[in-house]
Amino acid sequence: MKENMLFSGESKNIEYKVTVPDKSEKYMKTVVAFANGKGGKIVFGVDDKTLEIVGMNTENIYKTMDAITNAISDACEPAIRPDVALQTVKDKTVIVVEILPGAQRPYYIKSHGMIDGTYVRVSGTTRHVEGYMLKELILE
């Protein structure tokens, strides 16, 4: 994805996080929402309010990337396999997590179950699905 598109603001398929949260659940809702929709990217190292590229601490960045991959693989049902990559922008390194649209919808957070753990993306927000939307995802 081109840099100007990647950093043009949150949207239906882009989410920004300043850092990787200690609790993966803070971004897992977005992961399943992207898988339930047309896919998307989570960019760690960008302030979601100002769009300032703050970058990531590169000291243990590969461990961080592995932790993201493992968290997504372990927390989601059916399993989601993210593409996690580094990108350098204005001499700062960000982590870009790409989630492809899923073929086995609905995707949900395993620990919450299908009814409580299924999310979709609406514009630049992640929303819990209502009953009828869950049925639509199942029937797709």
Task: Name what the model sees in each region.
Residues 1-140:
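Conserved N-terminal catalytic/coupling substructures associated with nucleotide/phosphate chemistry
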